[in-house]
C-alpha cells in the first residue's frame, strides 16, 4: 500500500473518530468510547477491507448505526471491539480486564454467534439459525450489534465478488430479514430487504426505484392528507399518539408485483402508515 493511501486512510479514520466522539453526550462515556476506539485502531492495524479502507472503519460505522438506534454506550463500546477477539490475537480476558465484564460478555456473544451460527452448514436453514441465534444471544444487545454489523456490510457489499455478494444477500434475505420482523424492527427489515433485492435482482430494483421517483401517485401531500384526519380523530379522544407515514419499500412493491402477477401501475397500496399510541 502506497504512503499516500496510508496517509489518506489515517485521515479518514481520524475524521470518523472525531465525528463519532462528538455524538457521545457525556464526558465519562466519551472517554470510554475513545479508549475503545484507540484499542480497536491499534489491534486492527494493518487490516484492510475490500473497499481499501482500514478494517476499523467498519467498526466505527457499526458504532454510529447503534447511536442512530439510541443504544447505550456499553453497546457502542462493544461494537467498536466486536471483531477484535475474532480477527486479532486479543483474548476475551484482555477485553474484560480493559473494558469490564459487560463489554466482554457482549463481544463474546457476537463472536459465538459468528463462529457457531454462521459457519456451521447445519444451521444455515433459516429456522435452525433463528433458534440458535436467539439461544446464543442471551443479551438482546448481541443481536442488535449483529444487526448493525450486517446492515453496514450490506451497505458496502459492492466491493465484494459477485458470488460473495449473492451469498451474503441471500443469507440476509432468508435469515436477518425474518429475524428483524420477528423482533419488531420494521425499518431495519425493509432496509435489509431493499439492499438484498438490489444485489439479487438489480434490474427489478432499479426499475421499481425509477417508477417510484417518477410516479405522480407518490407525493408527500397525499401522505399528509391521509395522516391528518387520523391525527385529528385521535386527538378528539385525547389519545396521545405518534403517526409515521412513508412510501412502501422497493422490496415490498416488488413482492406485490411478483406475488400478484401485476404491473407497478396496478399496485395501489403504495403507502404505509404506522400509529403508535401511548
Where are the language model's segments positioned?
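Active-site helical microenvironments for divalent-metal-assisted chemistry
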Residues: 1-272, 277-278
Amino acid at each position: 500500500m502506497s504512503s499516500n493511501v496510508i496517509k489518506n486512510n489515517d485521515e479518514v479514520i481520524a475524521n470518523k473518530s472525531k465525528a463519532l466522539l462528538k455524538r457521545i453526550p457525556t464526558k465519562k462515556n466519551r472517554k470510554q468510547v475513545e479508549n475503545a476506539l484507540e484499542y480497536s485502531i491499534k489491534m486492527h492495524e494493518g487490516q484492510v477491507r475490500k473497499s481499501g479502507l482500514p478494517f476499523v472503519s467498519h467498526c466505527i460505522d457499526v458504532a454510529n448505526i447503534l447511536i442512530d438506534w439510541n443504544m447505550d454506550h456499553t453497546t457502542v463500546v462493544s461494537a467498536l471491539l466486536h471483531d477484535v477477539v475474532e480477527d486479532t490475537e486479543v483474548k476475551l480476558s484482555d477485553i474484560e480486564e480493559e473494558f469490564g465484564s459487560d463489554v466482554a460478555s457482549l463481544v463474546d456473544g457476537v463472536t459465538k454467534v459468528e463462529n457457531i451460527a454462521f459457519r456451521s452448514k447445519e444451521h444455515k436453514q433459516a429456522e435452525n439459525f433463528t433458534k440458535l441465534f436467539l439461544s446464543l444471544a442471551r443479551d438482546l444487545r448481541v443481536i442488535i450489534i449483529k444487526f448493525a454489523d450486517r446492515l453496514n456490510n450490506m451497505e458496502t457489499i459492492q466491493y465484494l465478488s459477485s458470488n460473495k455478494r449473492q451469498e451474503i444477500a441471500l443469507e440476509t434475505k432468508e435469515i436477518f430479514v425474518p429475524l428483524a420482523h420477528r423482533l419488531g424492527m420494521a425499518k431495519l427489515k425493509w432496509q435489509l430487504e431493499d439492499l438484498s433485492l438490489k444485489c439479487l435482482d438489480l434490474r427489478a430494483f432499479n426499475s421499481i426505484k425509477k417508477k417510484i421517483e417518477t410516479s405522480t401517485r407518490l407525493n408527500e401531500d397525499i401522505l399528509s392528507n391521509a395522516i391528518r384526519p387520523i391525527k385529528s380523530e385521535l386527538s378528539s379522544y385525547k389519545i396521545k399518539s405518534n403517526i409515521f407515514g412513508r412510501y412502501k419499500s422497493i422490496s415490498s412493491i416488488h413482492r406485490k408485483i411478483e406475488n400478484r402477477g401485476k404491473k407497478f401501475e396496478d399496485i395501489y397500496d403504495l403507502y404505509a402508515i404506522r400509529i403508535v399510541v401511548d
